[in-house]
């Protein structure tokens, strides 16, 4: 089923795909984004960071893509349940942030966001998706692996920790087929 942006969406945890849609984030979505960011992460991005990113959305190399996942749960009204932030590069996209509200984690929202990201990247002409994930975040790493991302490197002391230290990041990549059907080889 199409979600209005031309991309296919699968059902959400057994619910009709019509209960799910995506939209580009705007400054008017800042409260919802920050609520999710603060609930999902012990060290959330700042409002200033999101303001800067939202003002630089576009389709050129170096621009950002910020997409919101709207969902209508079985009981309740439609609301933003998650989002991703990605940066466009030459034939690549870099996932910078993916967050799902804790009340909607483990319900397939991350996979829907990743599916939408992959569709976006392929529509843009990307051949590879990149991301970094905390070494300690095994749950996220498993979600990324299940989606097809492979670990390719480690960034030492990449993330700050709540205790004031630093934590390594696993670098993961997902190779995408080109319009001609061929796929790059892993690094």
Region roles according to the model:
Residues 17, 91, 137, 159-166:
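Short acidic/glycine-enriched loop/turn segments that link adjacent beta-strands
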Residues 39, 81, 142, 156-157:
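Intrinsically disordered, low-complexity segments enriched in small/polar residues
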Residues 47, 51, 135-136, 158-159:
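Conserved beta-strand edge residues that scaffold enzyme active sites
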